[in-house]
């Protein structure tokens, strides 16, 4: 699940305009992006994953803020 991926791999989450930058451990970006894609959140237009960073693209800054908040809640739980 996306919650398990966040707890296992994510180190930080930060909004940048209509995007959310998700920092992960090395090699963690691909599984996190895949979990987010599979989740089908309506706020998320798509994801791009490198080795340790996921770029989550949203339709607008408000929706990016919602995604950042949701991810932070998962990270802090």
Residue ranges and their predicted role:
Residues 77:
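Active-site phosphate-binding and catalytic loops of NTP-dependent enzymes
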Residues 1-74:
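Non-DNA-binding regulatory cores of transcription-related proteins
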């Amino acid at each position: 699940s996306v919650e398990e991926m966040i707890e296992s791999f994510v180190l930080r989450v930060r909004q940048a305009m209509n995007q959310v930058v998700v920092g992960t451990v090395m090699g963690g970006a691909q599984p996190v992006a895949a979990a987010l894609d599979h989740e089908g959140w309506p706020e998320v237009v798509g994801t791009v994953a490198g080795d340790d960073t996921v770029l989550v693209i949203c339709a607008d800054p408000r929706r990016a803020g919602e995604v950042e908040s949701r991810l932070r809640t998962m990270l802090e739980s």
